[in-house]
Amino acid sequence: MLRIGYGFDVHQFGGCRPLTIGGVSIPCMKGIKAHSDGDVMMHSLIDALLGAACCGDIGSMFPDTDAKYNNIDSRKLLRIAWEKITMQGFLLENIDITVILQIPKINTYIYQMKHHLSQDLNCSVTSINIKATTTDTLGYIGRSEGIACIAVVLLTR
């Protein structure tokens, strides 16, 4: 059985948290506003994985009203969600992620991001595709007010 999941996340710049994408700290003059570490890649990926497995969403699994998730490393959340999903017999076929931001450029960090995901999901980096794009200065992302990420996953069981 094939199962497809789709995830989306967005965070506003302007907070005091460092910019973390895919578990990698990215130098940036603007911080992120968030309850956890604000890692849009991890958050959208968790939502995609949970969606494919029909296990709800990141907000119900890790509510921002629960203090134990304040400042938490989203890689830990990914590992917890993935353990729940694999206990149901799901296997990961592939991941396709698009990070949408005007600044900073992240292409030089993509290999590190893929490596983190492959470690956390116990899969090959060849099963993971990450790309970055801009909005050509349009909208809140184009004005460098925020960052967004879309993740699509294919699971089998």
Curated annotation (Swiss-Prot):
<dbReference type="InterPro" id="IPR003526">
    <property type="entry name" value="MECDP_synthase"/>
</dbReference>
<comment type="subunit">
    <text>Homotrimer.</text>
</comment>
<protein>
    <recommendedName>
        <fullName>2-C-methyl-D-erythritol 2,4-cyclodiphosphate synthase</fullName>
        <ecNumber>4.6.1.12</ecNumber>
    </recommendedName>
</protein>
<comment type="pathway">
    <text>Isoprenoid biosynthesis; isopentenyl diphosphate biosynthesis via DXP pathway; isopentenyl diphosphate from 1-deoxy-D-xylulose 5-phosphate: step 4/6.</text>
</comment>
<keyword id="KW-0414">Isoprene biosynthesis</keyword>
<dbReference type="InterPro" id="IPR036571">
    <property type="entry name" value="MECDP_synthase_sf"/>
</dbReference>
<feature type="binding site">
    <location>
        <position position="9"/>
    </location>
    <ligand>
        <name>a divalent metal cation</name>
    </ligand>
</feature>
<dbReference type="GO" id="GO:0019288">
    <property type="term" value="P:isopentenyl diphosphate biosynthetic process, methylerythritol 4-phosphate pathway"/>
</dbReference>
<feature type="binding site">
    <location>
        <begin position="35"/>
        <end position="36"/>
    </location>
    <ligand>
        <name>4-CDP-2-C-methyl-D-erythritol 2-phosphate</name>
    </ligand>
</feature>
<feature type="binding site">
    <location>
        <begin position="57"/>
        <end position="59"/>
    </location>
    <ligand>
        <name>4-CDP-2-C-methyl-D-erythritol 2-phosphate</name>
    </ligand>
</feature>
<feature type="site" description="Transition state stabilizer">
    <location>
        <position position="35"/>
    </location>
</feature>
<dbReference type="GO" id="GO:0008685">
    <property type="term" value="F:2-C-methyl-D-erythritol 2,4-cyclodiphosphate synthase activity"/>
</dbReference>
<feature type="binding site">
    <location>
        <position position="43"/>
    </location>
    <ligand>
        <name>a divalent metal cation</name>
    </ligand>
</feature>
<keyword id="KW-0456">Lyase</keyword>
<feature type="binding site">
    <location>
        <position position="11"/>
    </location>
    <ligand>
        <name>a divalent metal cation</name>
    </ligand>
</feature>
<comment type="function">
    <text>Involved in the biosynthesis of isopentenyl diphosphate (IPP) and dimethylallyl diphosphate (DMAPP), two major building blocks of isoprenoid compounds. Catalyzes the conversion of 4-diphosphocytidyl-2-C-methyl-D-erythritol 2-phosphate (CDP-ME2P) to 2-C-methyl-D-erythritol 2,4-cyclodiphosphate (ME-CPP) with a corresponding release of cytidine 5-monophosphate (CMP).</text>
</comment>
<feature type="binding site">
    <location>
        <begin position="9"/>
        <end position="11"/>
    </location>
    <ligand>
        <name>4-CDP-2-C-methyl-D-erythritol 2-phosphate</name>
    </ligand>
</feature>
<feature type="binding site">
    <location>
        <position position="143"/>
    </location>
    <ligand>
        <name>4-CDP-2-C-methyl-D-erythritol 2-phosphate</name>
    </ligand>
</feature>
<feature type="binding site">
    <location>
        <begin position="62"/>
        <end position="66"/>
    </location>
    <ligand>
        <name>4-CDP-2-C-methyl-D-erythritol 2-phosphate</name>
    </ligand>
</feature>
<comment type="similarity">
    <text>Belongs to the IspF family.</text>
</comment>
<dbReference type="Pfam" id="PF02542">
    <property type="entry name" value="YgbB"/>
</dbReference>
<dbReference type="GO" id="GO:0016114">
    <property type="term" value="P:terpenoid biosynthetic process"/>
</dbReference>
<keyword id="KW-0479">Metal-binding</keyword>
<feature type="site" description="Transition state stabilizer">
    <location>
        <position position="134"/>
    </location>
</feature>
<dbReference type="GO" id="GO:0046872">
    <property type="term" value="F:metal ion binding"/>
</dbReference>
<feature type="binding site">
    <location>
        <begin position="133"/>
        <end position="136"/>
    </location>
    <ligand>
        <name>4-CDP-2-C-methyl-D-erythritol 2-phosphate</name>
    </ligand>
</feature>
